[in-house]
């Protein structure tokens, strides 16, 4: 257990913030006034806060398989509202392209 929390770095925005033990990446970002990931339902259902974890260990909460299919989760895609760091993390915000079909695995990096 790390009482000081973990550093989370979002590569596209260049922003970083601290995430307390047991706190989701999205809640930590909001609490510190950062805006590198869009905020939606905060409960794993809308898919708006989709990220790819580039490095670090984390625990995932419940996420809609309509937004993060098992194959995508295996490729380190997750919803920031359901990502709970266990080490420092490097993440990248991603947007889904082509609708919300679980079998549609087209993702694109958002650079704007």
Swiss-Prot record:
[2Fe-2S] cluster binds at residues 41, 46, 49, 81. This is Ferredoxin, plant-type. InterPro entries: 2Fe-2S_ferredoxin-like_sf, 2Fe-2S_ferredoxin-type, 2Fe2S_fd_BS, Beta-grasp_dom_sf. Keywords: 2Fe-2S, Aromatic hydrocarbons catabolism, Electron transport, Iron, Iron-sulfur, Metal-binding, Plasmid, Transport. The keyword Chaperone does not apply. Ferredoxins are iron-sulfur proteins that transfer electrons in a wide variety of metabolic reactions. One of its GO terms (molecular function) is metal ion binding. The gene is xylT. Belongs to the 2Fe2S plant-type ferredoxin family. One of its GO terms (biological process) is catechol-containing compound catabolic process. Pfam families: Fer2. The keyword Magnesium does not apply. Pathway: Aromatic compound metabolism; catechol degradation. Residues 6-97 form the 2Fe-2S ferredoxin-type domain.
